[in-house]
A protein has these predicted regions:
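An N-terminal-biased, well-structured beta-alpha scaffold segment characteristic
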Residues: 1-23, 124, 144, 149
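Short, well-ordered coil/turn residues at beta-beta hairpins
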Residues: 2-3, 132-135, 159-160
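Short beta->alpha connector loops at strand-helix junctions that form conserved
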Residues: 3-4, 19-31, 101, 119-120, ...
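NAD(P)H-binding Rossmann-fold N-terminus in SDR/SDR-like oxidoreductases
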Residues: 6, 81, 85, 165
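Short glycine-rich, flexible loops that bind phosphorylated cofactors or substrates
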Residues: 8-9, 136-138, 165-166
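Rossmann-like dinucleotide-binding domain for NAD(H)/NADP(H)
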Residues: 18, 22, 145, 149, ...
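Phosphate-binding beta-alpha-beta segment of Rossmann-like dinucleotide-binding domains, i.e.
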Residues: 18-20, 25-73, 85-88
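Rossmann-like dinucleotide/phosphate-binding beta-alpha-beta segment
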Residues: 63-153
C-alpha cells in the first residue's frame, strides 16, 4: 500500500511478473483531498503561513488580512469525485465556479453556481484555481508558461493532482515575475 492514488509511481509490469496484484481504491480519499484543497486555498488567501512565521518571530506589528474567498471565482480543472467535492465546499463561500473536464457533468456544475468553460478562460478569470485532473500525455505540463501568464497576478493555484500537470520551471519563473510586479 502507498499514500495517495494512481499507478504513476508503481512498476506495474514488475508487480505483474511477480504475481502481485496492483489495484486502486477509487474514492477512498476524495473527501480528504477536497478538504485539503479548500484548506490550502484558505491558507493562501489569508496568508496563514507568513503570518504564523511573523508572529513566531515576534513581528506581529505588521497587519495583513489577505483576501476573502467569499464571492470569488473558483476554477476547477477536473470535476470527478474530488473536483465535485471542492465545488460543493465552495458553495459555502458563494463562489462562482468555472469548471473544465473532458467528461463534463453539466447538471452538477450548474446546480452549484458554475459553468463549464475552456482552460484559457478558466485561467484568465479565476481568483483561485484547483487542479484535480489525472496525469496523462494530454495533461502533462498543462499548466505551462502561457497559462500561468494568463492568470491574475493575485490568483492562487492549488495542485492536489499530479505534479507533472504543472510545468514547475514555468511556475518558478512566473512566481519571480509576480514578485517583481509587487515590489
Amino acid at each position: 500500500s502507498r499514500y495517495g492514488v494512481g499507478y504513476d509511481k508503481v512498476d506495474v509490469a514488475a508487480a505483474r511478473e511477480l504475481g502481485i496484484l496492483v489495484s486502486i481504491a477509487p474514492g477512498a480519499n476524495s473527501n480528504s483531498v477536497a478538504d485539503l484543497a479548500m484548506a490550502l486555498m484558505l491558507a493562501a488567501a489569508r496568508h496563514v503561513c507568513p503570518m504564523d512565521a511573523a508572529i513566531r518571530a515576534g513581528q506581529n506589528s505588521k497587519p495583513t488580512t489577505g483576501v476573502e474567498m467569499w464571492g470569488k471565482t473558483l476554477g476547477v480543472v477536473g470535476t470527478g469525485r474530488i473536483g465535485k467535492g471542492v465545488i460543493q465546499r465552495a458553495a459555502g463561500f458563494q463562489m462562482k465556479v468555472l469548471a473544465n473536464d473532458a467528461y463534463p457533468d453539466q447538471a452538477f456544475v450548474e446546480a452549484h453556481n458554475g459553468t463549464y468553460t475552456d482552460l484559457d478562460t478558466l485561467f484568465r478569470e479565476s481568483d483561485f484555481i484547483t487542479l484535480h485532473a489525472p496525469y496523462t500525455e494530454e495533461t502533462k505540463n498543462m499548466v505551462d508558461s502561457r497559462r500561468l501568464k494568463e492568470m491574475k497576478s493575485t490568483a492562487v493555484l492549488v495542485n492536489t493532482a499530479r505534479g507533472g500537470i504543472v510545468d514547475e520551471e514555468a511556475l518558478y519563473e512566473r512566481r519571480e515575475d509576480v514578485a517583481e510586479e509587487i515590489n
